[in-house]
């Protein structure tokens, strides 16, 4: 039986609105287009929420080890309920509970914009990655424009209350290039998705 808990993230991905659904489909299509460029046998989704991204990736790939981690205990409980064949743990992206180079691929979707020190989070993602990381963040100002167009967060000019960092596509690529090597990226309105290789 599904838990009563549903985060705003879960509601966003399950929203029946056709435009919202179309944007989410495009988002995951772009992610899968990037992932076909690499080989990996183990995956960590850091900031996995309820495991919906893992579910999308699993639909295309089956033969690898998957871990999901999130700060929210209710989200982890729901993820375990929805995907009981996978491993989900509670943890903080700023202090990942894994050894160095534990995973061939680490994904972190829509997390870094919530961090006061995103460089610390990125360092941890790189530490536990033995190969690649896949990141996504809102592409500003398009994310806020999209919110305004649908009447969301009007008093904050479209900005989500939890978003501390605001990057354009070029700004984000420049920012992460100080710590990792960008292989490829995709713009999927209103997000940017970047595939990087751990060169540390």
Tell what function each PLM region has.
Residues 1-99, 122, 149-200:
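Conserved N-terminal segment of class I S-adenosyl-L-methionine
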Residues 41, 104, 131:
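Conserved acidic residues
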Residues 68, 114, 135:
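Conserved SAM-binding loop
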Residues 107:
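A conserved beta-strand element that flanks and buttresses the S-adenosyl-L-methionine
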Residues 111:
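Hydrophobic adenine-recognition pocket in adenosine-nucleotide-binding enzymes
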Residues 115-124:
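A short, conserved alpha-helix within the catalytic core of class I
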Residues 130-138:
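Conserved beta-strand signature within the Rossmann-like core of class I S-adenosyl-L-methionine
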Residues 139-143:
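Short "lid" loop at the C-terminus of a central beta-strand within the Rossmann-like core
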């Amino acid at each position: 039986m599904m838990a009563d808990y549903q985060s705003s993230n879960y509601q966003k991905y399950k929203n029946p609105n056709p435009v919202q659904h179309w944007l989410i489909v495009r988002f995951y299509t772009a992610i899968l287009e990037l992932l076909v460029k690499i080989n990996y046998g183990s995956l960590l989704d850091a900031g996995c929420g309820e495991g919906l991204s893992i579910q999308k990736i699993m639909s295309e790939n089956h033969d690898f080890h998957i871990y999901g981690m999130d700060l929210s205990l209710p989200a982890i409980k729901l993820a375990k309920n929805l995907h009981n064949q996978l491993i989900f743990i509670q943890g903080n992206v700023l202090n990942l509970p894994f050894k160095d180079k534990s995973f061939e691929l680490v994904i972190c979707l829509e997390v870094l914009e919530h961090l006061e020190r995103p460089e610390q989070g990125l360092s941890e993602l790189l530490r536990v990655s033995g190969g690649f990381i896949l990141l996504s963040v809102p592409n500003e100002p398009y994310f806020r424009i999209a919110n305004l167009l649908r009447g969301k967060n009007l008093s904050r000019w479209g900005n989500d209350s939890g978003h501390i960092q605001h990057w354009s596509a070029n700004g984000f690529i420049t920012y992460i290039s100080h710590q990792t090597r960008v292989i490829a990226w995709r713009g999927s309105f209103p997000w940017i998705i970047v595939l990087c290789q751990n060169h540390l």
